[in-house]
């Protein structure tokens, strides 16, 4: 987050998000995931990757019609992104082994809902 006011209600609900302040170690891209000059990195402050970003405009400009979603948490950011992706008419795939949640029951329930309503849930082997 760039300031104490950004996403204040979201951060009040989930205080651990306060560890994600701009410039801190908790927001660095893992060095095992190399980022080149040609890559586009999007900064987000809310659950969905689409909310208050230009991700949809950029994806459409690139001719993208399908997304593979990975990340944390299944019940939060992953689900919100999958729902918004569907609303923007993307074919959405969530890789079950590449998402997680602090609550195993919430993880399973959200994968079930995503598969039933918003996209496809698969294993990494299914992507090939």
What are these regions (language model features)?
Residues 3, 10-128:
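Active-site-adjacent betaalpha module
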